[in-house]
A protein has these predicted regions:
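Eukaryote-biased recognition of C-terminal alpha-helical segments
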Residues: 267-284
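Cyclin-like alpha-helical protein-protein interaction core
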Residues: 12, 25-27, 31-110, 116-266
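PEST-like, low-complexity acidic/proline-rich intrinsically disordered segments
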Residues: 1-16
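Hydrophobic alpha-helical targeting segments used for export or membrane insertion
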Residues: 1, 110-111
């Protein structure tokens, strides 16, 4: 019998940076997934803004304690959001469900992290003793309940049909960064990779605020919904924000990058620039 690896003890130097090697895996028919994801986002009438900001920060915090790689961190965020969407579709009282998730958020996060970790590597588990220790240390008002955790884990797996959502946003950011920043020799690879992960955490945590800041300029709600649902555009804006924080203020370089990314995303360059500025503004 193979020994299971406790993910909380696994951590490598590359876990804290973007995967900027040439074998990232986002090269075969890669835009189809994003087109499909955009259409699903447009069709989803269930807003998750009341739950996801706090959930995103909690996932990032617990991933740091468990020393989980960022690929699991960002995929866990997307998987939790998918869980919320799928449940709201079927739940007769969505407000009650939202309250239940918020009240028991640490348990939901642990359940999601456990599922995503196993899907990334079937031999890995989260150390149960460490789960209890971390939750009690970070959420002292939370009463530890193994039965409740087991019930939530079962509910999560059943609702998601044992499927997780790999982070399309992370994949696109890695691809665009390799093609549009590293090839220009603007900054060191390790610096760009570390900066990219930090910016992605901000984008995930502040996504609702970032898009809300653009609403005063919106003339067509349907087009804005499509814009918000497109992870390629968000990835492009994130990469141009990385470029900006690399002190690459040369207007010609920035314009060339935005123009090329706009062709990949099938969007006007100014829309990428507006979204980039919104990202930068939530940081400043």
């Amino acid at each position: 019998m193979e020994k299971q690896t406790t993910l909380a003890t696994v951590n490598s130097p590359t876990d804290t940076v973007l995967n900027l090697s040439t074998d990232s895996g986002f090269y075969t028919d890669w835009k189809y997934e994003y087109q499909l994801d955009t259409e699903q986002g447009i069709a989803n009438p269930y807003p998750t803004d009341t739950i996801m900001p706090a959930a995103t920060r909690m996932i990032s915090t617990l991933c740091a304690f468990f020393k989980l790689p960022h690929s699991i961190e960002f995929s866990a965020i997307d998987t939790l959001e998918q869980l919320v969407i799928e449940t709201l579709k079927k739940d007769a009282s969505p407000d009650k469900f939202a309250e239940n998730v918020v009240e028991n958020l640490p348990f939901y996060v642990i359940a999601i992290l456990s599922l995503v970790s196993k899907c990334f590597n079937a031999r890995t588990i989260l150390d149960p003793a460490l789960q209890k220790q971390i939750l009690q240390a970070n959420f002292p008002d939370l009463e530890w309940n193994e039965q409740k955790l087991a019930t939530i884990e079962f509910k999560v797996m059943k609702t998601l049909n044992y499927k997780v959502s790999q982070s399309l946003l992370l994949g696109a950011v890695e691809r665009f960064t390799k093609e549009d920043i590293l090839t220009r020799g603007i900054a060191r690879k390790d610096f760009v990779g570390s900066l990219g992960i930090k910016l992605l955490r901000v984008v995930y945590a502040q996504k609702s605020q970032i898009y809300a800041s653009l609403k005063p300029n919106v003339k067509c709600q349907d087009l804005f919904t499509r814009f918000k649902s497109n992870k390629l555009i968000l990835a492009a804006a994130t990469v141009t924000a990385i470029l900006k924080f690399c002190a690459a203020d040369e207007e010609l370089v920035a314009d060339n990058v935005v123009k090329r990314l706009s062709n990949d995303c099938f969007v006007e360059p100014k829309n990428i620039t507006l979204l980039r500025d919104a990202i930068v503004n939530v940081i400043r």
